[in-house]
Curated annotation (Swiss-Prot):
Cellular localization per UniProt: Secreted
Role, per record: Mast cell degranulating peptide. Causes histamine release from rat peritoneal mast cells in vitro. Has antibacterial activity against the Gram-negative bacterium E.coli K12 and Gram-positive bacterium M.luteus NCT C2665.
Alphabetical UniProt keywords: Amphibian defense peptide, Antibiotic, Antimicrobial, Disulfide bond, Inflammatory response, Mast cell degranulation, Secreted
Protein's organism: Lithobates sevosus (Dusky gopher frog)
An example Gene Ontology CC term for this record: extracellular region
Disulfide bond annotation, renumbered to this chain: 23-29
Similarity comment text for this entry: Belongs to the frog skin active peptide (FSAP) family. Ranatuerin subfamily.
Gene Ontology BP, a term: positive regulation of mast cell degranulation
Coiled coil: none
Transport among keywords: no
Name recorded for this polypeptide: Ranatuerin-2SEa
Expression (tissue specificity): Expressed by the skin glands.
InterPro entries, alphabetized: Antimicrobial_frog_2
Pfam families: Antimicrobial_2
Length: 29
């Protein structure tokens, strides 16, 4: 349903943001 799609999208975005932050913090870009 719509809610599940939104949740999945939010999870994907959050994961991408977290990965980017980890990359910058660890200098592993």
């Amino acid at each position: 349903g719509f809610i599940s799609t939104v949740k999945n999208l939010a999870t994907n975005v959050a994961g991408t943001v977290i990965d980017t932050i980890k990359c910058k913090v660890t200098g592993g870009c």
